[in-house]
Amino acid sequence: MQIDDALLQRLEKLSMLEIKDEHKESVKGHLAEVLGFVENIFALETNNLKTDTHLSTPLREDEPKSQPHIAKEILSQNKHSQDHYFVVPKIIE
């Protein structure tokens, strides 16, 4: 696809960007490269490819573990704790 001044001006308007005159030729070149890459992707023959629709990550069983020493250590890092909970300032009236 050819990127001309009219198309670049339209893209500027749609994107609400202003491209300085000294950068316009460079931007047109970069856009042409991107569109060329997209055209290559569209040209790929994918009709006969087998798709893997059942890909998933196997789940592990959740096994609760009681580790009270970890909770005590975490609560000890805070200056304000009470009855195994963090005490924080009231933020909702």
Swiss-Prot record:
InterPro entries per record: Asp/Glu-ADT_sf_sub_c, GatC
Q: Which residues cross the membrane?
A: none
Could you tell me the EC number(s) of this protein?
A: 6.3.5.-
Q: Name one Pfam family in it.
A: GatC
Recorded catalytic activity of this chain's protein: L-glutamyl-tRNA(Gln) + L-glutamine + ATP + H2O = L-glutaminyl-tRNA(Gln) + L-glutamate + ADP + phosphate + H(+); L-aspartyl-tRNA(Asn) + L-glutamine + ATP + H2O = L-asparaginyl-tRNA(Asn) + L-glutamate + ADP + phosphate + 2 H(+)
UniProt-listed Gene3D superfamilies: Glu-tRNAGln amidotransferase C subunit, N-terminal domain (1.10.20.60)
- Keywords annotated in UniProt: ATP-binding, Ligase, Nucleotide-binding, Protein biosynthesis
Q: Name one GO molecular function term.
A: asparaginyl-tRNA synthase (glutamine-hydrolyzing) activity
The top EC class is ligase
One GO biological process term is: translation
Q: What is known about its subunit structure?
A: Heterotrimer of A, B and C subunits.
The UniProt similarity line reads: Belongs to the GatC family.
**Stored NCBIfam families:** gatC
This molecule's function is given as: Allows the formation of correctly charged Asn-tRNA(Asn) or Gln-tRNA(Gln) through the transamidation of misacylated Asp-tRNA(Asn) or Glu-tRNA(Gln) in organisms which lack either or both of asparaginyl-tRNA or glutaminyl-tRNA synthetases. The reaction takes place in the presence of glutamine and ATP through an activated phospho-Asp-tRNA(Asn) or phospho-Glu-tRNA(Gln).
Q: What is this protein called?
A: Glutamyl-tRNA(Gln) amidotransferase subunit C
Native organism taxonomy: Bacteria, Pseudomonadati, Campylobacterota, Epsilonproteobacteria, Campylobacterales
Q: Which gene encodes it?
A: gatC
